[in-house]
Amino acid sequence: MDNTNSLPFVYTVTSSLTNVVGATGSSTLIMQADSRFELMGIMATGGATAASEDNIQYPNFFSVSIRDQTTGRDLMSGPVPQRVLAGNAFRQFLEKRGIIFEPQSNLLFTFTNLQALTCNITLALHGYKMIL
């Protein structure tokens, strides 16, 4: 990564799931047109309330699968639980090498509820905009 042509940037994806185990929801994220995006880390929250996650070191309220609809590639072989993919704000998942997405890449996130709680999910993709 070239620091002269990159800016720290965060994309967010949100979804709400009903209080039924197995309930699903999806959200689409289209990357901005002015730059590539290098994904460096993922953080997430998804409990019924902030307090339901604050005291949990490795929360596990939902699973998610991510598909790059621009290329037709899945970013994982199946749904991945929150605690494996994202952890929480104190224990985020960091990529060893950045994953680069082209401008206007279209990502589909499919979420599944793992608890009998209403989940309001926010997934944050931390990385760098690489200005073209």
Language-model segment annotations:
Residues 1-132:
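Beta-strand-centric surfaces of beta-sandwich/beta-rich domains
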